[in-house]
């Protein structure tokens, strides 16, 4: 398995994503936002940061980068796509995930560890966790308030697309939502950073299982 780790001007978690993939026992390669082909890749990791300086709004300019058409193609083919923080914002901007990310209710940038609950462990991203398991991931965002219409929210609930919730909501997200998947279950977006939660020495290794779950799910289908 080989992941494409996208790199935009202003990305600052691409190395963490790369490290998470390698730590999971698979290959990874940095891919510039101007690239027009993702042939040869089995999945996409869209890192956090401030793509294009967050001008216009977070993820807006990245959403029209040349590589995005290939991200959409891989997603349509059922390949795993994970967007974290700014990556989540990009996924909502390009329509692969519903809803939007707004400014935190506090209007402050939040950077700390947060306790989260796995509320759906039947996905390619969470199947190594226990249902209801509590995990610790770092958060680092100013626009992490997940918002959607009531209609979209009811659809998310009906399809079991909400996979991760905050235990103590730090940003005002609708129903404490921290992470969701698309209807097919192969595209995931979350504001917390599992790629920064790989070592107990650094405070938490709760994120290891997420990347291992992605690899496990892919291998079950392809090996």
Curated annotation (Swiss-Prot):
<feature type="active site">
    <location>
        <position position="195"/>
    </location>
</feature>
<feature type="domain" description="Glutamine amidotransferase type-1">
    <location>
        <begin position="3"/>
        <end position="223"/>
    </location>
</feature>
<dbReference type="GO" id="GO:0005524">
    <property type="term" value="F:ATP binding"/>
</dbReference>
<dbReference type="GO" id="GO:0004359">
    <property type="term" value="F:glutaminase activity"/>
</dbReference>
<comment type="subunit">
    <text>Part of the FGAM synthase complex composed of 1 PurL, 1 PurQ and 2 PurS subunits.</text>
</comment>
<keyword id="KW-0067">ATP-binding</keyword>
<keyword id="KW-0436">Ligase</keyword>
<protein>
    <recommendedName>
        <fullName>Phosphoribosylformylglycinamidine synthase subunit PurQ</fullName>
        <ecNumber>6.3.5.3</ecNumber>
        <ecNumber>3.5.1.2</ecNumber>
    </recommendedName>
</protein>
<keyword id="KW-0378">Hydrolase</keyword>
<comment type="pathway">
    <text>Purine metabolism; IMP biosynthesis via de novo pathway; 5-amino-1-(5-phospho-D-ribosyl)imidazole from N(2)-formyl-N(1)-(5-phospho-D-ribosyl)glycinamide: step 1/2.</text>
</comment>
<keyword id="KW-0547">Nucleotide-binding</keyword>
<feature type="active site">
    <location>
        <position position="193"/>
    </location>
</feature>
<dbReference type="GO" id="GO:0005737">
    <property type="term" value="C:cytoplasm"/>
</dbReference>
<keyword id="KW-0963">Cytoplasm</keyword>
<dbReference type="Pfam" id="PF13507">
    <property type="entry name" value="GATase_5"/>
</dbReference>
<dbReference type="InterPro" id="IPR010075">
    <property type="entry name" value="PRibForGlyAmidine_synth_PurQ"/>
</dbReference>
<dbReference type="GO" id="GO:0004642">
    <property type="term" value="F:phosphoribosylformylglycinamidine synthase activity"/>
</dbReference>
<comment type="function">
    <text>Part of the phosphoribosylformylglycinamidine synthase complex involved in the purines biosynthetic pathway. Catalyzes the ATP-dependent conversion of formylglycinamide ribonucleotide (FGAR) and glutamine to yield formylglycinamidine ribonucleotide (FGAM) and glutamate. The FGAM synthase complex is composed of three subunits. PurQ produces an ammonia molecule by converting glutamine to glutamate. PurL transfers the ammonia molecule to FGAR to form FGAM in an ATP-dependent manner.</text>
</comment>
<keyword id="KW-0315">Glutamine amidotransferase</keyword>
<feature type="active site" description="Nucleophile">
    <location>
        <position position="85"/>
    </location>
</feature>
<dbReference type="InterPro" id="IPR029062">
    <property type="entry name" value="Class_I_gatase-like"/>
</dbReference>
<dbReference type="GO" id="GO:0006189">
    <property type="term" value="P:'de novo' IMP biosynthetic process"/>
</dbReference>
<keyword id="KW-0658">Purine biosynthesis</keyword>
């Amino acid at each position: 398995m080989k992941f494409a780790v996208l790199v935009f001007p202003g990305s600052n978690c691409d190395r963490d994503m790369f490290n998470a993939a390698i730590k999971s026992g698979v290959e990874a390669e940095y891919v510039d936002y101007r690239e027009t082909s993702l042939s040869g890749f089995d999945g996409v990791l869209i890192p956090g940061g401030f793509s294009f300086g967050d001008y216009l709004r977070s993820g807006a300019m990245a959403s029209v980068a040349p590589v995005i058409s290939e991200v959409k193609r891989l997603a349509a083919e059922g390949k795993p796509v994970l967007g974290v923080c700014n990556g989540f914002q990009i996924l909502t901007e390009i329509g692969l995930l519903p809803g939007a990310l707004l400014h935190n209710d506090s209007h402050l940038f939040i950077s700390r560890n947060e306790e989260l609950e796995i509320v759906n462990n039947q996905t390619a991203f969470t199947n190594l966790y226990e249902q209801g398991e509590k995990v610790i991931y770092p958060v680092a965002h100013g626009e992490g308030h997940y918002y959607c219409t009531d209609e979209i929210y009811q659809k998310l609930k009906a399809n079991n697309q909400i996979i991760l919730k905050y235990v103590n909501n730090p940003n005002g997200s609708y129903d404490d939502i921290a992470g969701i998947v698309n209807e097919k279950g192969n595209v995931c977006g979350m504001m917390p950073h599992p790629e920064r939660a790989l070592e107990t020495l650094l405070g938490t290794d709760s994120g290891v299982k997420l990347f291992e779950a992605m690899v496990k799910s892919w291998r079950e289908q392809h090996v």
